[in-house]
Amino acid sequence: MKDYIKALVNYGLEHELIQQADSRYVYNRILDVMRLDRGGGTAPKGEPLTAILTALTDDAVRRGLIGDSITERDLFDTRLMGELTPFPHEVHDRFVREYAVSPERGTDWFYNFCGDVNYIRRDRLARDIRWVYKSEYGPMNITINLSKPEKDPRAIAAARRARQNGYPKCQLCAENEGYAGRLDHPARQNLRMVPVLLDGKFWYMQFSPYSYYDQHCIFLNQKHTPMYIGRETFDKLLSLVTMLPHYFVGSNADLPIVGGSILSHEHFQGGLDVFPMTKARIEGMTFFDGFPDVKVGIVKWPMPVLRLNCASADRIVDLAERITCVWRDYNDEAAGIISETDGVPHNTVTPIARRDGVRYELDLVLRNNRTTEEYPLGVFHPHPELHHIKKENIGLIEVMGLAVLPPRLKTELETLKNAILSGSDIRADASIAAHADWADELMRKHEFTPENADEILRQEVGAVFVRVLEDAAVFKRTPDGRAALQRFITSVNRIVSF
C-alpha cells in the first residue's frame, strides 16, 4: 500500500517547509485532515507534488469527505498544503534574511517558496498558451489563460445556496492569509505575505496565484479601502521601486471599465517582467513648465503614454500630480473627451513605475471611461466587433502589452480552424458563430492550409489585440489625435503654479 501522506511529509522536508523534528506532528495533522486514525505502507518515490495531492484528494472523494468538483478539490488540497506551510512570521523572517543579501534574492526566494507550497500552482501555469505578435509598436505578448480554473456549475449552484458571511471582505484583504475558504471563496491556508511599510502604513506583498507574468506580485493595503489615483499613489509606487529596484510596480485605474476587476481594495501589481510597453521607443519629447529636470517622452504605443524620467522621485511625483489633476477636469469635445457626466468622473490615469539605472521612471497612460448609447461598455473600450476575442476591461496588464485572453478561445480557435479548413458553415455552429465575420475577412486575406492555419489564427488574434488597445486610446494615433494630445499638454503648461 502506498502511503501518500508520508510522501507529502517527505515533500515538505525536501523543500525545507518543515524540519525533521516536525515530521511526526505534520503526519498526524494530515491524518486528521484525511479523517484517518492510522497510516501505513511505504511512501512512493519520485512522485511530483501534483500526483501526491491528486491521490490524496481522490481518496477523499471516494470516501465521501468532499464532492468531486474542482472547487471542492482545490479547497481540500489547499488545506493539505496548509499543514506544510510555515507560520507567517517564519516566512517574513526568512524573506528579511534573503533580502539583506539583495532585493533580487529576497523576491526570488519568496516566489519559489509560493510555488513550493502550491499557492502558485505550477502545473496549471504550464497549461497557459503563449505566443508573440510582432506589431508596429514592437512585440506584443499574447496568452490564453488556462491556469485560473473555471467554476464548476455544481459549485456555482452550491455557492449560491450557501450563506454569505462577508469575511474576508474581498479576495485581496489581509484576512485571507490562512483562511480555509468556502465554495464562493478560495482557500488560502498556504498564502503567505510580507509586510511593507508605505507612507507610515502597513501594506503587504504577496504573489498572484495565477502568475500572468514572471514574479507577478500584488501589493495590498492592509485596510479595505477603494482604489485611488493621486499624489499618494505615485509616491507609493516610486517608494516600492526604491525597495525593489529590479521590479516594476503599477496601479490599475480607479474608475470602472478602465480599472481592474477589483476596485474596492487599494492594491498595486508588480514583478520582473519587462513588458512590451517598457521596450517601446520614444517617438517624441515634450516639456512642462517648471520641470526642466524631468525628461518627458511620448511613447510610440497604441494608447497615449507620457513617460516621466528624473533622478528625483519627488520631482516625478510633483509633475505626475500636476498632469493628473489637469486631466481629471480636462474636456475636449472635438476629441470626444468629456471629464464628467452629472458629477460622475470619467478621466483618470494608469501609472507604472520602474527604475532606469539610478533614475526613476513613471509612465502615465491617459484613460477615460465614458459610455454612450452606441458604446454602452465604453467609448474607449474594445468595440463590439472585437468582443469575440476580448470583451473584458483593459487593465494595467493589457495596457502594458500583455493580452490575457479568456480560456474559451482555446477550444473556439481549434473549432474555427477545422471549420475553415473543411469549408463548414461557421455561422451554423453556435460555438464559433461570433467569429464568422472575422473568419470571412481572414479567408479573403490568407490561403489556409493544415500547416499554416494555427499560426495565421494566432497572428490575427495578436492583430485584434492591438486594435483593442487602439480602441482604448483616448487620443488616437492620427494627425487629429496627435494634435489633441498636444492641446492637453499645452493645457497642463498653462498651470503656472500648483
Give the positions of each predicted feature.
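Catalytic or ion-translocation cores adjacent to nucleophile or general acid/base/metal-coordination motifs
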Residues: 232, 241-264, 270-324, 328-331
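Active-site microenvironments that recognize anionic phosphate/pyrophosphate groups
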Residues: 1-219, 223-227, 302, 317, ...
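Helical scaffold of the NTase/Pol beta-like nucleotidyltransferase catalytic core
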Residues: 190-192, 222-249
